Amino acid sequence: WWYGHNAVGFFLTAGFLGMMYYFVPKQAGRPVYSYRLSIVHFWALIAIYMWAGPHHLHYTALPDWAQSLGMVFSLILLAPSWGGAINGVLTLSGVWHKLRTDPILKFLIVSLSFYMMSTFEGPMMSIKTVNSLSHYTDWTIGHVHAGALGWVAMITIGSVYAMLPKLLGREQMFSVKAIDTHFWLHTLGVVFYIASMWIAGVMQGLMWRATNADGTL
């Protein structure tokens, strides 16, 4: 998991944050809210992410000190994660009205909402008492897909929609209405999917707690 969580942290976070820092200001027509914050939270992610992996190994043969260290670093990770997300959202200061008419901007900003949700949920699930309920359940699957389908997929789709007209020499995409429909279908689909996983996961965890050591209720 030292490798596994770095894969999540760098393949599915750092690169897509770079996309966010390019396409959100471009689409909003505004400068990044804070360049200093972008640099600070980037290096904080680099420094902290590698020690978050042990939170996947709570209540296993991993030494208890390593499990606790993974939990602490996961909780610290909340600060740089939300720092980047808030920096992206506040880039819209003064142009919030564009969200009503620009579905590409909706994709980009709602992806940040999913990023904030999954980067809050991850540290929360790393707490040992919470993890004793969530571990090995569908809750974890819901958490991963909030990041994969909510953050990674939506920032990618928004970026592609923003980039294609420029590559093809057009003023805008063929149908803005179709992009808006795509946005709502995707958002509702992800919400229903991850909510069902959360509910199923909590029920699984509670049922396991209801059994005795020999597996009987």
How would you name each of these model-derived features?
Residues Y3-Q27, R36-L57, L69-L92, L105-K128, ...:
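Hydrophobic cores of alpha-helical transmembrane segments in multi-pass integral membrane proteins
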Residues N131-T140:
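Flexible, glycine/threonine-enriched loop-and-boundary segments that flank and lead into catalytic domains
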